[in-house]
Regions:
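A cross-family phosphate/adenosyl-ligand binding-site feature
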Residues: 1-60, 67-156, 160-344
């Protein structure tokens, strides 16, 4: 329903703009013209839109959209600063071809992006507010020469799902990611890396300030001892490449964990999943391991589903086949449950 008349008596509420304002969980003004921005900044409420927004006590998000010169006008910028002072969140406009024919800043972001702002506010209970969460995701690539590298089949989907789920639940999320072909989740700090060494450095540089660390990345265990400067040409006979171990990130985190920090690892196995994963739990001083078997249908790389077993010191919890998004939230539920038990 589109409301235009501020005092239309045909609706069930006599003062429609007030009743609508009371029902809102979040308000988004998109696109927001210079005129609307100016009115709101100076308390002018003379139509259905501005009176409704003035009556709202919920989160308010505004997406300016106008000609580049108008957007950059100091008066508009001052008005946006006033709105920010009063708690409005201002979305930076995109750049591109504008309705006036110019090209520049002032374009409204795509509706899908605007929806992400709304989902961040209302999609999930904010039970991770105040928590800093570090997630690792994706594969690493270890160069052989300028053309070839050693890697694995990880898509990063599980790690990205965990990062987004934690963000939607109110956490401050850092995502350290190897090369992935999927869009990173919004509102997280993305730290792109390529090699295992880069991931080790990125993770250990911020690990001490994290409340929760979930290491879902598939990091190479070995790398070439020597990286060739030029492409290795095909020759007669066999060729061998000497490999050396990479640093064990999870072992380092377990050995150097901060008091009260929760540490969750992942374990992809092809045999003896429970035994190998429980051994990892103990050896690396983890709180939980999310284990899966590559040979189980729906649990492998690249897919949108997973079949996990959550292994802790006290129990093994087997999950059914489900989307990686659902699995991410169950993992976070379990982490929060264990953390609350510790506090009692």
């Amino acid at each position: 329903k589109c409301l235009v008349d501020t005092f239309d008596r045909n609706f069930q509420f006599q003062v429609e703009h007030v009743s609508i304002a009371k029902q809102a969980d979040v308000v988004m003004i998109a696109p927001a013209s210079a005129n609307v921005i100016g009115k709101l900044a100076h308390g002018i409420a003379d139509d259905m839109l501005t009176t409704t927004i003035m009556a709202c006590k919920c989160k308010k998000i505004i997406s300016p959209a106008m000609n580049t010169n108008m957007y950059e006008n100091p008066i508009v910028q001052d008005n946006l600063a006033i709105l920010q002072h009063y708690g409005y969140e201002v979305i930076e406009p995109a750049s591109g071809y504008l309705a006036c024919g110019d090209t520049g800043a002032g374009k409204m972001p795509e509706p899908e992006m605007l929806l992400e702002y709304i989902l961040r506010e209302i999609a999930k209970e904010k039970d991770l507010t105040g928590q800093k969460v570090l997630v690792t995701a994706g594969p690493t690539q270890e160069a052989i020469d300028p053309v070839r590298y050693i890697t694995n089949h990880s898509s990063g989907k599980m790690g990205y799902a965990l990062a987004k789920a934690a963000m939607l639940r109110g956490a401050q999320v850092t995502l350290v990611s190897g090369p992935c072909a999927i869009e990173p989740p919004p509102f997280v700090k993305l730290v792109p890396i390529v090699t295992a060494k880069e991931m080790f450095d990125a993770v250990t540089s911020v690990s001490f300030e994290q409340d929760i660390i979930i290491k879902a990345a598939a990091v190479a265990d070995y790398r070439p001892a020597k990286v060739f400067d030029d492409k290795v040409k095909k020759q007669e006979g066999q060729m061998s490449i000497e490999l050396e171990k990479t640093d064990d990130i999870l072992q380092y985190l377990g050995d150097n964990r901060v008091p009260g920090q929760f540490l969750c690892g992942f374990s992809m196995e092809t045999q003896n999943m429970l035994g190998n994963s429980r051994a990892k739990l103990g050896k690396k001083h983890l709180d939980m391991v999310a284990a899966n078997n590559l040979k189980v249908a729906g649990a492998g790389f690249q897919g949108d589903t997973n079949v996990l077993t959550l292994i802790t010191q006290d129990e093994d919890v087997s999950l059914q086949l489900m989307s990686k998004e659902d699995a991410a939230n169950i993992i976070l539920d379990k982490i929060l449950s264990i953390m609350k038990e510790r506090e009692q």
